[in-house]
Each structure stands twice: as structure tokens, then as C-alpha cells.
């Protein structure tokens, strides 16, 4: 994709790598599908970096503006389906 991910320059390099992987997983859920456990593990790591609901909503809004993909909707879908299933939006 030809856009910039929302990143906070206060995050460590490791946290930035984790966030990019998480954004890529959300894209994958929309474009091809992703195994639920893979997405949920990245979401858990995302929540360690961004524990605040307000910050999570801000990042989701910024990501949706540049990509057209909703983090919230993808995670809600993942929570609704059974383990070992594909999350596809």
C-alpha cells in the first residue's frame, strides 16, 4: 500500500515493528484473510503498546483514514468467530 501507518515516535524500534506487523495483519484480514489466532496475538501485543482505549480509537481513526480499513471492525469480527478460522472482511 502507498500510505504511512500511524506511528508514535516515542515508541521503541521493537514497538514500531510490532505496530507495523499489526497494521499489516489488519490489511491481510481485509485483503486475503488471516488466521484468527495470528491476528489476536498481534492485537494483544498492540494493546501492550497502546493500553488506552482513547489512544486505540485515535490510532484506529488515523489508520482508517489512510487505508480504509477499520481495526475495530476486524478485531470484532475475530472475536465473533471460532478458533483456527480465517478472519476475512
UniProtKB/Swiss-Prot annotation:
Coiled coil, from the record: none
Xref: InterPro entries: BH2638-like_sf (IPR023324), UPF0223 (IPR007920)
Gene3D superfamilies recorded: BH2638-like (1.10.220.80)
Superkingdom per UniProt: Bacteria
Pfam families registered for this protein in UniProt: UPF0223
Family listed: Belongs to the UPF0223 family.
Name of this protein: UPF0223 protein BCA_4066
Amino acid at each position: 500500500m502507498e500510505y504511512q501507518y500511524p506511528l508514535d515516535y516515542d515508541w521503541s524500534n521493537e514497538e514500531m515493528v510490532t505496530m507495523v506487523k499489526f497494521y499489516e495483519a489488519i490489511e491481510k484480514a481485509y485483503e486475503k484473510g488471516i488466521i484468527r489466532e495470528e491476528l489476536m496475538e498481534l492485537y494483544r501485543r498492540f494493546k501492550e503498546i497502546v493500553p488506552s482505549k482513547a489512544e486505540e480509537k485515535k490510532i484506529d481513526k488515523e489508520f482508517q483514514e489512510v487505508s480504509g480499513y477499520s481495526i475495530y471492525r476486524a478485531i470484532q469480527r475475530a472475536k465473533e468467530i471460532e478458533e483456527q478460522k480465517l478472519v476475512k472482511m
